[in-house]
A protein has these predicted regions:
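Two-component system phosphotransfer/interaction surface
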Residues: 108-121, 150
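A ubiquitous structural signal for well-ordered alpha-helices
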Residues: 23, 115, 129-132, 148
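A donor-sugar binding/catalytic signature common to diverse glycosyltransferases
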Residues: 44-85
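A short, well-ordered alpha-helix in the C-terminal region of glycosyltransferases
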Residues: 125-139
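C-terminal alpha-helical cap of glycosyltransferases
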Residues: 138-156
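Short histidine/acidic/glycine/proline-rich micro-motifs that form metal-
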Residues: 15, 78-82, 135
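Donor-nucleotide binding loops and adjacent catalytic segments primarily
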Residues: 1-53, 87-91, 95, 102-111
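Hydrophobic alpha-helical packing elements
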Residues: 108-112, 129, 141-145
Length: 156
């Protein structure tokens, strides 16, 4: 519950849909105007661009999308990945002032709500974090890859 209206869009994946149905029964809430639950999101770039704040895992492609659209984030790296790479990905954004990282072992509902509420209460800081995220984006990656491939082809 927030003083300002918040729309929470939650992508569950295949197995999370039932979890939300179970929570609805257990906790007495239902998705409505402020909570939209989807199994899969087809228009992620559009929704990321419209978001004020993104709560997400910290896979490399997800972070590249956040950087491309310049969005502040709360990142919860998955501990169940090779060499804990999501943690290191997330920490780079936090060091750059583009994200707040909460490790899963430290995550509680209360901590997440407090973190999100504090961030949403500071629109100027959110905007700054978004600019910091955008500054990390590599916009010429296609050109870089093409140049590298051309050098390989031209090398005898």
């Amino acid at each position: 519950k927030n003083a300002k209206p918040v729309l929470h869009l939650h992508a569950t994946g295949q197995y999370g849909v039932q979890l939300f149905k179970d929570l609805e029964k257990e906790k007495g809430f239902a998705p409505g105007d402020s909570l939209v639950v989807k199994e899969y999101i087809n228009n992620m770039p559009e929704l990321l661009a419209a978001a004020d704040l993104v709560i997400s895992r910290a896979g490399a492609l997800t972070l590249a999308e956040l950087e491309a659209v310049g969005r502040a984030a709360v990142l919860i790296p998955s501990p169940n990945v090779a060499e804990n790479h999501q943690y290191y990905n997330a920490m780079e954004l936090q060091k750059a002032g583009a994200a707040v990282v909460i490790e899963e072992k430290d995550l509680t509902g209360e901590k997440l709500v407090q973190t999100v509420s504090e961030m949403l209460a500071q629109p100027g800081k959110l905007a700054e974090m978004g600019k910091n995220a955008r500054s990390l984006s590599v916009d010429d990656s296609l050109d870089r890859i093409a140049d590298a491939l051309l050098k390989l082809v031209k090398t005898p």
